[in-house]
């Protein structure tokens, strides 16, 4: 499968667009490119705010799933056990709520992704110490809208 086809399949699944020939959407992926663009929400300086936590000590914030994930893209979730190494962390501090995007690959053991997520989302300077649990990762900060608004991960 070519990289372009893989990206299109990922976005069709993430957006809930059925494939070609599926009842209700015979055009398949064409619908993605005709969909209206949703503007990014206004910023409220979310990195200065406290995170909310659920009953299982997971932060309540939006996480974009790594490419190939079957997780829902708009809710917080624990990383599935087969995604146990992180090679890139993208922090979007100007989103409301803040978004931390993890790309997982390899077989290294991931101790606790939520420790790093909380530190990245609420720390004033980027807390590099929290990333030590993740091993060697690339960290990027930007001011672009959330991925669900601008259509995908950054080029590598």
Curated annotation (Swiss-Prot):
Q: Name one Pfam family in it.
A: Herpes_UL1
State the UniProt keywords alphabetically: Disulfide bond, Fusion of virus membrane with host cell membrane, Fusion of virus membrane with host membrane, Glycoprotein, Host cell membrane, Host Golgi apparatus, Host membrane, Membrane, Signal, Viral envelope protein, Viral penetration into host cytoplasm, Virion, Virus entry into host cell
Please give the chief subcellular localization of this protein.
virion
Question: What does the record say about PTM?
Answer: O-glycosylated, and sialylated.
* Cleavable signal peptide: 1-16
Q: Where in the cell is it found?
A: Virion membrane; Host cell membrane; Host Golgi apparatus, Host trans-Golgi network
Residue ranges occupied by any gL alphaherpesvirus-type domain in the UniProt entry:
50-156
**Membrane topology note:** Peripheral membrane protein
Q: What does this protein do?
A: The heterodimer glycoprotein H-glycoprotein L is required for the fusion of viral and plasma membranes leading to virus entry into the host cell. Acts as a functional inhibitor of gH and maintains gH in an inhibited form. Upon binding to host integrins, gL dissociates from gH leading to activation of the viral fusion glycoproteins gB and gH.
Assembly state and interactors?
A: Interacts with glycoprotein H (gH); this interaction is necessary for the correct processing and cell surface expression of gH. The heterodimer gH/gL seems to interact with gB trimers during fusion.
The superkingdom listed in its UniProt entry is Viruses
Q: What is this protein called?
A: Envelope glycoprotein L
What cystine linkages occur within this chain?
71-95
UniProt lineage: Viruses, Duplodnaviria, Heunggongvirae, Peploviricota, Herviviricetes
User: Is Transcription regulation one of the keywords UniProt gives this record?
Assistant: no
Q: Which family does it belong to?
A: Belongs to the herpesviridae glycoprotein L (gL) family. Alphaherpesvirinae gL subfamily.
């Amino acid at each position: 499968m070519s990289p372009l086809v893989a990206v299109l399949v990922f976005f069709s699944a993430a957006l809930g667009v059925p494939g070609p020939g599926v009842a209700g959407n015979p055009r398949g992926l064409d619908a993605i490119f005709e969909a209206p663009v949703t503007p990014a929400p206004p910023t409220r300086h979310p990195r200065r705010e406290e995170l909310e936590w659920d009953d299982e000590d997971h932060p309540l914030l939006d996480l974009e799933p790594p490419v190939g994930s079957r997780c829902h893209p708009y809710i917080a979730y624990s990383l599935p056990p087969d995604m146990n190494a992180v090679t890139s962390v993208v922090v979007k501090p100007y989103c409301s709520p803040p978004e931390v995007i993890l790309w997982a690959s390899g077989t290294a053991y991931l101790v606790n992704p939520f420790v790093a997520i909380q530190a990245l989302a609420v720390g004033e300077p980027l807390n590099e110490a929290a990333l030590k649990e993740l091993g060697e990762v690339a960290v990027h900060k930007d001011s672009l809208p959330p991925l669900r608004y601008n259509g995908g991960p950054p080029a590598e």
